[in-house]
């Protein structure tokens, strides 16, 4: 069947819901929270209209939502949920259980700032606070990547038996409408066949226990196997991303998308919708003679160390844009990037710019101002101040 995209004007949240529908998810368990709610509402609409054969489990909290997903996934079902901010924090314990039990659940997290004070706007701290739970994390720049990301996340997760989080920006994507090219169901089915579970609690001929006590003699190896699965996932992510591109014309074979790096003195590095603004700014800066490029981190977990080293070897500096912060330290992407480069031969000048916390706008003008600051760093050959809270009101 020839690929002819079905173009719909949808929000990022509706793109996620359509992707779950097209992935033929079997069980959805979720609890509503702004700005995630319309994902689950749309899925409920699909069920009510007879468009989807999905078992929907209404629960009393996000902790229960993930617990229900764990139970469903452990029986072999393809399982989906979505949450945001405080809801994701409430899920924290169960995220460890899902990863430790090697269950390929896919969850959409709509990035929202953590309270207090209350905020419903974009901030990556909620998802990045869960970086050590064993979940893979894919960050979408736009609504198209939300849709594509969910489909690819299932294929990767079910190959390596590790859960995956697809992350989109609150309101900037979740409630903003754009054209999304959707894939005919028959072609999605060819790309994403039915799940073949690693084990199933519904297989009564081979009964097993999941999450039972492991003594010190065994626990260590369980952790090692999960770590190896994340390493294996890097290869699978590239293979799945390449296949997706060959089938549907949108290539995701690189864990870090780059632009203009061949002759760049420095690059902007960041994740999510912020990088759409960066791309526009870089296009304008290039016309003004700036030797600047960009590196958009698509997959934060597993961390694309090898690709980052290759990029770092070709530039003099990296301006890391973090829409998050680890208190007592610095931006989280900045910390991870420095650690990845420490034992490599690449040692570019690196400066961390904290931007956009709590949904504060980051404009093309802001990026151009940061470019001017980074240009001075390159010209001087030293970093004057490693971490800058850009546009801080005083």
UniProtKB/Swiss-Prot annotation:
Its EC number is 1.2.7.7. One of its GO terms (biological process) is organic acid metabolic process. CDD domains: TPP_PYR_PFOR_IOR-alpha_like. It is an enzyme of class 1 (oxidoreductase). GO terms for molecular function: 3-methyl-2-oxobutanoate dehydrogenase (ferredoxin) activity. Heterotetramer of one alpha, one beta, one delta and one gamma chain. Gene3D superfamilies: 3.40.50.920, 3.40.50.970. It comes from Pyrococcus furiosus (strain ATCC 43587 / DSM 3638 / JCM 8422 / Vc1). This is Ketoisovalerate oxidoreductase subunit VorA.
């Amino acid at each position: 069947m020839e690929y002819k995209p079905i173009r719909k004007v949808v929000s990022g949240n509706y793109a996620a819901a359509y992707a779950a529908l097209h992935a033929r998810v079997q069980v959805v368990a979720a609890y509503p929270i702004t700005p995630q709610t319309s994902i689950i509402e749309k899925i409920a609409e699909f069920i009510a209209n007879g468009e989807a054969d999905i078992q929907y489990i209404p629960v009393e909290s996000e902790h229960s939502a993930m617990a229900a997903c764990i139970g469903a996934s452990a029986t072999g079902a393809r399982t989906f949920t979505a949450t945001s901010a405080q809801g994701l924090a409430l899920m924290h314990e169960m995220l460890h259980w899902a990863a430790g039990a090697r269950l390929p659940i896919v969850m959409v997290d709509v990035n929202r700032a953590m309270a207090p004070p209350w905020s419903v706007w974009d901030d990556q701290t909620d998802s990045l606070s869960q970086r050590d739970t064993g979940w893979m994390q894919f960050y979408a720049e736009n609504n198209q990547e939300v849709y594509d990301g969910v489909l690819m996340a299932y294929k990767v997760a079910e190959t390596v038996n590790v859960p995956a989080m697809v992350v989109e920006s609150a309101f900037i994507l979740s409630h903003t409408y754009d054209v999304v090219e959707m894939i005919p169901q028959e072609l999605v089915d060819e790309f994403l066949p039915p799940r073949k579970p690693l084990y199933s609690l519904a297989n009564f001929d081979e009964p097993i226990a999941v999450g039972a006590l492991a003594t010190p003699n065994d626990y260590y190896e369980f952790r090692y196997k999960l770590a190896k699965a994340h390493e294996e996932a890097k290869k699978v992510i590239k293979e799945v991303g390449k296949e997706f591109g060959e089938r549907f014309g949108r290539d995701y074979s690189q864990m870090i998308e780059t632009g203009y790096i061949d002759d760049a003195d420095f690059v902007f590095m960041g994740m999510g919708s912020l990088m759409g603004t960066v791309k526009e700014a870089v296009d304008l800066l290039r016309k003004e003679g700036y030797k600047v490029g960009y590196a958009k981190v698509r997959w934060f977990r597993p961390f694309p160390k090898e690709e980052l080293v290759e990029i770092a070897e070709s530039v003099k500096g990296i301006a890391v844009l973090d829409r998050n912060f680890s208190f007592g330290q610095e931006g989280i992407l900045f910390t991870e990037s420095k650690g990845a480069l420490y034992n490599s031969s690449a040692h570019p000048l690196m400066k961390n710019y904290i931007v956009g916390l709590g949904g504060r706008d980051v404009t093309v003008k802001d990026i151009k101002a940061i470019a001017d600051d980074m240009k001075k760093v390159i010209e001087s050959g030293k970093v004057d101040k490693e971490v800058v809270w850009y546009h801080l009101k005083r």
